[in-house]
A protein has these predicted regions:
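Alpha-helical tetratricopeptide repeat
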Residues: 1-73
Length: 73
């Protein structure tokens, strides 16, 4: 996916999240942030999603991956 489409997707997800906080939307936005190289924002969204569902395996995996990427930078 190109950067412009990723940015548009993040903007639309942000609108939806602002309307109604949702773990799946937070996780999806975190994935876009990670893909765009915005590891800090990806971590924030993972943390927010994990507050809603602390045992969600995919989000835990993404959070751990993003933490590793942050420490590699």
């Amino acid at each position: 996916m190109d950067e412009q489409k990723e940015t548009e997707a993040v903007e639309e997800l942000t609108k939806a999240i602002n309307f109604k906080l949702d773990m799946q939307m937070l996780r999806l936005r975190a994935a876009f942030y990670e893909s765009m190289g915005d590891i800090s924002s990806a971590l924030q969204d993972c943390e927010a999603a994990l507050c809603l569902d602390p045992n969600h395996a995919e989000t835990l995996d993404m959070y751990q991956r993003a933490q590793k990427l942050r420490f590699q930078s």
